[in-house]
Amino acid sequence: DVIGNPVASARNCEEMNRQGIPAIPTFHLGSPWSMLVDMAKDYPKLALGGMVGKPTALKGRFIGQAFARVWPKKVHAFGVGSRRLLRKYPFHSADASNWEQGPTAYGRWQAYGNMSVRGGSQNLRGEVEWYLRLERELQGRWHKEMKLLGGQP
């Protein structure tokens, strides 16, 4: 993945697949939309990236435009942990580090209603349990859509 150079990213993904590594191409915020459409034609799954640190509203517009262009398609989200965005779009998979960084770096705990608790060493069990509940909620929310996509992987 070469953030800021969509052509190099596509070339790297193609080469990995050529060598038998089932790489998933990543479409970054700010890349030409035509590349996303091409990825969707050529690969069974694609990823959306380049969103870490961006405002949620900007992420939402980007994700909405991506889904409008490629749905139904398996889509992975890099750097998306927002419950609102995960409930709004049928991601096949997603990952983010905010489950850990929110509490430890900024004192923001989803498990406690986004309450700010700082200081000392933190036990992240409550936060992990909150995200596991969110995962179950999303599985129920998007059950029909995932069935349409053919399940796993």
Over which residues does each language-model region extend?
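Long, polar low-complexity repeats
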Residues: 45-47, 58, 62-68
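Hydrophobic faces of well-ordered beta-strands that scaffold small-molecule active sites
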Residues: 23-27, 46-48, 73-78, 92-96
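Active-site beta->alpha loop and helix N-cap motifs at the rims of alpha/beta catalytic domains
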Residues: 1-33, 38, 45-52
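Short loop/helix-cap segments at secondary-structure boundaries that form the rim of catalytic
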Residues: 34-42, 85-90
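Alpha/beta catalytic cores of nucleotide-metabolism and tRNA/nucleoside-modifying enzymes
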Residues: 1-18, 64-75, 82-153
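His/Asp/Glu-enriched short active-site or ligand-binding loop at hydrolase and phosphoryl-transfer sites
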Residues: 44-55, 95-103
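Short, polar loop motifs at secondary-structure junctions
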Residues: 29-32, 80-84
